[in-house]
Amino acid sequence: MVKKKIDNRIRVMIENGVKLGHRTMFIVIGDKARDQVPILYDILTKSTVKARPTVLWCYKNKDEAISNHGKKRAKKIAVGKVDVNEADLFDSFRVATTIHGRYYSETHAVLGRTYGVCVLQDFEALTPNLLARTVETVEGGGLIILLLKTLQSLKQLYTMSMDVHKRFRTEAHQTVTCRFNERLILSLADCKRCLVVNDDLTVLPLSSKTINVEPVNPAGAGRSPNEASLKELKESLLTVQPAGALVNLCKTYDQANAVAQFIEALVDKQLKPPMSLTAARGRGKSAALGLSIAAAVAFGYVNIYVTSPHPENLITLFEFVLKGFDALEYQEHADYTIIRSTNADYKKAIIRINITRSSRQTIQYIAPSDTHLLNAADLLLIDEAAAIPLPLVKKMIGPYLVFMASTINGYEGTGRSLSLKLISQLQKDNNARPPLKLEESIRYQENDDIEKWLINLLCLDASTVPSISSGCPTPDACELYYVDRDALFSYHKAAEAFLHRLVSIYVSSHYKNTPNDLQMMSDAPAHHLFCLLGPVQRMDALPEILVVIQVALEGQISAQSISDSLGRGKKAAGDLIPWNVAEQYGDRDFPKLCGVRIVRVATHPNYQRMGYGKRAIQLLKDYYARKHTNLEDGPVASKDAGKGIEEVEEEELSLLKEQIRPRSRIPTLLQRLHERVPEHVDYIGTSYGLTTELLKFWKNAGFVPVYLSQKSNELTAEHSCIMLHTPNATPWLGLYYQDFRRRVLKLMGKTFREFETKLCLALLKNKSVDTEGSALKVLDKPMLDVYFLPHDLQRLESYARQQSEFRLIIDLLTDIAQLYFQGRIDGLQLDLVQQGILLALGVQGKTVDALGLELNMPGNQLLAKFFDAMKRCNQCFRSVLEEHIEGGMLREADLSKGEELQPLTLSLDKELDQTAQKLSKQQRKELKRLKAEQLDEFQIKGTEEDWSKALETNGTGGGSGLLSVKSGVKRLDGPIETREDGDLAAPLSKKKKKNNPKQRRSQGKSLI
């Protein structure tokens, strides 16, 4: 193999980094780029006088040389089972080096750890988040090596399709412009500690800043300006134990001072406000917490709890706990025992240390969600508090000593959660002292060029918002401008200053930001930026930004995609509002509409609550309603104008001669709204975490809620709410809101029970939507019978008359509240407090005491308001019943007034004669009918004389009470049955009966 001399600039660059304690970046281009890593690593090891540095190797797909297969091969080589190919340097490198292979999806576990070399391959899988996580783990003097495949020009990266772009594309917007990659390459050209080489380590002329690399003078290099102060502090605490032994382990004056402050708080053993420690990456926060834990053990604290987003983030913390134990002369196994996790995801991280030297003490890791385990805590330490959801951090603070540390800029701290919300709230509520700050870097020395490059690239220093010196213009004098993203991410000096201002407003006014948001802002094809500016005073200076609005176009989804989504459960990327609304209401036509979603509205923190946000939203609504007309004669810019990324032909490329420079033709950064044609939209929407203030803001802006998530957000513990506004009046928005209000009203007693009453009332009332066309049926008697029994109404009547207490009608409040808030009870007028009481007691199921605390009202006043509301409700129900009864009665207009009466044609005498004739005729007819019948058998026998004698005989008392007279007809001896039909007559009895003397005496007589 022919050996080639390596460019001396590579060796000088690495040696300078080791002398200065600064990191060095190499971009290796070519298919054999991986084979150059051992060479660069060998130069590094020869330049340092310490143990061989560890390597963090990150990849998207499994790399057999780095993963388990490579480890097994390295073991076989070490024991001599496999011969090492001397030509293959990678085998020797693999055997002699500790390499930690990580998938990009697992890099969250490397936070807080330190490596000597970081290798990043599979450039298409890189994201700003991954870049920030991995680069910041490299110590001073270490290497960051970025491996790229063969390229004809670095400008090919401008149009490379990145993996993250799949999430940016939507069905209606497929073309992605790689503005972030262009800005990344241009920023590398400005970095003095970055070299671009090919796969035979030939240095490429990326920029003129790396043409000459001169060795630095090692005299005074790497020394801290506060070294004398650190030495003085260590000497002053030398005789004070355990503080002296622990402070002696600190590397910087800031870190030593922080440890001393923590120890001072531990000595008192009294409940104090939480102490905070803030710093940028690599300043030694975790190490300071670890030494403080060792001091707490020495002072006798029994239950010490440590929490962090992930146990692997605490590797440095526990490492310095053990170093503190060594300084205090604790012996492992004799004085303490280490327990590691058996969870495969935690990679055998330390989760517990049991100390048994003088008494039983415990250092225990708990997950951020296990706040219920802190009841017996004596000390709680929270590492990387900014990466933990803010509600969980608030729950952790209790009646025990709390130390917390967090990154306020850098990857973990790119949100205002800790620096602006939590710490300021602690200072206000608990009278806590200002947070301790670590300025000096430990992982690498100050003025590290790689740190400056990364901060500028990802705008990680945006936590400090520049103040505006131009005063407060009136909102009506401010105008909204469209921001051209090609110009914003062109890496022009003015554009960079404007971008940093814009991102700083984002970070300071939004809960959580990540570096990935910057790439979405730059590359997502459906996203657009607007900013509200005051009156421009100077034309030679950048205008001050008051409000930033980021929007995303959504909708225009095909019928086939809608069918796949709703029928098969598949959802495409993006289009948040169309998919959620279509799924919520089963409307297959809504995703076909074109809409715009307001992703963020960020107001400068010094000018919040002054009407600027409302003004910006109003101008945006007018813009998409096409109310901004161009009064000039010049042509209007197309909405697709300004595609600033130039495609370069391969014949024109030369990697060995190419120098990267910003584009010479840059479009206008800011455009007036009338200079750009707006996209056609059917609605404007927004999605945000529901709070009372934000709901009030969007309602005042004319938006209507149509969706409320039942699952709260893990980071903010808020429920996502979608609100819509239509430029033109549409009936479907009122129907959506009517259904939304009905659903939310039912869920307020379940999922949304913990909501504040005023928030629930705000959800149920909206003046921006017309619900008249979708009004429900007003309460009537049949509906009243469905909801209430007569006895229920009697109970309500009894309470209204003060004849019973309110608990007797508590069960009726649910139905009353449902009817009232659905608008079914016509004529029932309640004030705002009465509405809140009815909603809280009837729907949310809150108690009177809890509601009194929430509304800040005494119980007797609350019940008085409640009584008045129920009295009015009873009157409405009575009016419904009265109307029903009146409806069943004849109205006065329906009564007969005699208009249809006619005079009689006959006189009274003639009418009586006529009736008598009819009666006589009827009697004669009846008599004739009776004569025709045979009534002889019913004739009573005997004469008048016979009946008189019989009566006299009976009257004297000699008889038996029966009257008997002679009939004059002789009866036969046997019974005779007369039949009308002789053939059917039954035969006479053949058996002859004996004559009875009594029967013979009574023959011929008839008994009555």
Curated annotation (Swiss-Prot):
SUPFAM superfamilies for this protein: Acyl-CoA N-acyltransferases (Nat) (SSF55729)
Molecular function per GO: 18S rRNA cytidine N-acetyltransferase activity; ATP binding; tRNA binding; tRNA N4-acetyltransferase activity
Enzyme class: transferase
Chain segments carrying region Disordered: 950-1008
GO cellular component: nucleolus; small-subunit processome
Residues that hold ATP according to the record: 282-291, 443
Biased composition (Basic and acidic residues): 970-982
Residues involved in acetyl-CoA binding: 601-603, 608-614, 700
Subunit structure: Component of the PRC1 complex (PSC, PC, PH and dRING1) in 0-12 hours Drosophila embryos. This complex is distinct from the Esc/E(z) complex, which contains many other PcG proteins like Esc, E(z), Su(z)12, HDAC1/Rpd3, Caf1-55 and probably Pho. The two complexes however cooperate and interact together during the first 3 hours of development to establish PcG silencing. Part of the small subunit (SSU) processome, composed of more than 70 proteins and the RNA chaperone small nucleolar RNA (snoRNA) U3.
Family in the record: Belongs to the RNA cytidine acetyltransferase family. NAT10 subfamily.
HAMAP family in UniProt: RNA_acetyltr_Nat10 (MF_03211)
Function: RNA cytidine acetyltransferase with specificity toward both 18S rRNA and tRNAs. Catalyzes the formation of N(4)-acetylcytidine (ac4C) in 18S rRNA. Required for early nucleolar cleavages of precursor rRNA at sites A0, A1 and A2 during 18S rRNA synthesis. Catalyzes the formation of ac4C in serine and leucine tRNAs. Requires a tRNA-binding adapter protein for full tRNA acetyltransferase activity but not for 18S rRNA acetylation. Polycomb group (PcG) protein.
Record protein name field: RNA cytidine acetyltransferase
Species of the source: Drosophila melanogaster (Fruit fly)
